[in-house]
């Protein structure tokens, strides 16, 4: 009947992944996903129709959910020893062909970007790598790297994670490089007559 919904399950027949509803006037069945991360087949909805003569006919409706994996491009920056660097990996929503039409699942800008702690796997806002420096991520995915004063070379970098509107994650690395700075000096030479005090810099 109108307004009623029936649970829709994953292929295992146990895990709820959405609901079915039917328009009694047209017989059109609508599948509404509730588990946005699920992809694959959904258990079919059995639909029974009856004509004016009372003849019943049964059919099934089987939706299939095609995955759309978001993509990410890593970022690299280079600066001199001691300088704070910022870099931003680029994230794009995933696309999939559905019935000959390209569909995109956009990135979710309401969920802040995080760094992945390589030791624990936890998602964090700030991370210190011993002997290297401290990384901090802004909600939009911009990473700030504050190197330790003596650190030079290519850093191990960090993994940045964002998700699309279905909650599907995408990861990319940010790798800063620190160029060494060697202080330079110019020899000072002065000349004066014998017995005079001289200064040089």
Feature names for model-found ranges:
Residues 11-59, 126-172:
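Acidic, turn/loop-rich segments in luminal/extracellular domains of secretory-pathway
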Residues 12, 23, 51, 79, ...:
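Acidic-enriched, low-complexity/disordered segments with a strong bias for Aspartate over Glutamate
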Residues 2, 6-7, 20-22, 70-72, ...:
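Generic structural motif
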Residues 18-20, 83, 113, 125-127, ...:
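Conserved positions within tandem-repeat grammars
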